Amino acid sequence: GLGDVYKRQCPSCRKEYITVSDRRFHAEPVACNHCGPSYYALYNKVKVTDYSELLNLSSRLLREGEVIAAKGIGGYHLICDARSEKAVSRLRDIKQRDGMPFAVLFRDIENIRRYVFSNGVEEKALLSWRRPIVLLKQLRLLASSVNPGMETLGCMLPYMPLHSDWFERLDTPALVMTSGNISECPITITPEEAEKQLAGKIPVSYTHLRAH
């Protein structure tokens, strides 16, 4: 209830939350570095909570061709460098998914234009707050196993700060981003489900705490 939320807030967030004239009055997304949301990662069974350390670790692993898991707005995603054949092949092994195409998270709209054909309507959809996956005709290849035998590519743009922070540290134009579950299994939503399905298959899993 609102009382529980109130008790867990820092003084600054609490003041915004209870002041009727404040634009954040009883707003669900009231947040700060103290109250969260916050990320943590499990790496070699060690819990890492420093955000800069999390970013540096995940960026290094992605550069090295590893597959990582990260919780999105809903469930987990499996992520790798979309240019790395080694990484995408490894992702297919983890997913047990031979031929189905993967969706790709691009750095920005300029890089989308480098790899696919897009018109104004499609770009407007890509840039909208909903950040949908838009199926577009491919212009040039990323790793060939991203969408084997296909002439189209599922494209989307960053919709979380974590995505933009990754691209600031990486030189790749795009990351493969697919649901964090093994084929025929339901999508992983909780850390426990991610651990059960992905243990031993990936080096690190990122989880955010969006709610108190």
Sequence positions of predicted segments:
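Internal gly/pro-rich beta-alpha loop/helix module
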Residues: D171-R210
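Short, cysteine/histidine-rich loop/knuckle motifs that typically chelate Zn2+
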Residues: S12, H34
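A phosphate-binding glycine/aspartate-rich beta-alpha loop in the early core of alpha/beta enzymes
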Residues: V67, G75-Q138
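Cys/His-rich microdomains that often coordinate metals
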Residues: Y17, Y39
